[in-house]
């Protein structure tokens, strides 16, 4: 008695479409999708400087390169 059936959800969906319209819902879904894409992109950008920092510290840890051919 407390759960909703599929018919109830379809009625709610139709009412939402009538109130907001398909264009507003499509624009809202597009905005949410682009926000998620930007969020994932920022997560990957945060990882890149850490990797680059680790590779530069390894090259400086080996010390300066000496040229033994010239005296």
Curated annotation (Swiss-Prot):
Transmembrane segments: 1-21
Subcellular locations according to the entry: Cell inner membrane
Stretches with biased composition (Polar residues): 52-65
Region (Disordered): 43-71
Gene Ontology biological process terms, A to Z: protein transport by the Tat complex
Cysteine disulfide partners in this protein: none
Keyword Plastid listed: no
Recorded topology in the membrane: Single-pass membrane protein
Keywords of the record: Cell inner membrane, Cell membrane, Membrane, Protein transport, Translocation, Transmembrane, Transmembrane helix, Transport
A GO cellular component entry from the record: TAT protein transport complex
Listed GO MF terms: protein transmembrane transporter activity
Complex and partners: The Tat system comprises two distinct complexes: a TatABC complex, containing multiple copies of TatA, TatB and TatC subunits, and a separate TatA complex, containing only TatA subunits. Substrates initially bind to the TatABC complex, which probably triggers association of the separate TatA complex to form the active translocon.
NCBIfam families membership: PRK04561.1, tatAE
Function comment: Part of the twin-arginine translocation (Tat) system that transports large folded proteins containing a characteristic twin-arginine motif in their signal peptide across membranes. TatA could form the protein-conducting channel of the Tat system.
Family assignment from sequence similarity: Belongs to the TatA/E family.
UniProt-listed HAMAP family: TatA_E
PANTHER family in the record: SEC-INDEPENDENT PROTEIN TRANSLOCASE PROTEIN TATA
Name of the protein in its database record: Sec-independent protein translocase protein TatA
Organism this protein belongs to: Xylella fastidiosa (strain Temecula1 / ATCC 700964)
Gene designation per UniProt: tatA
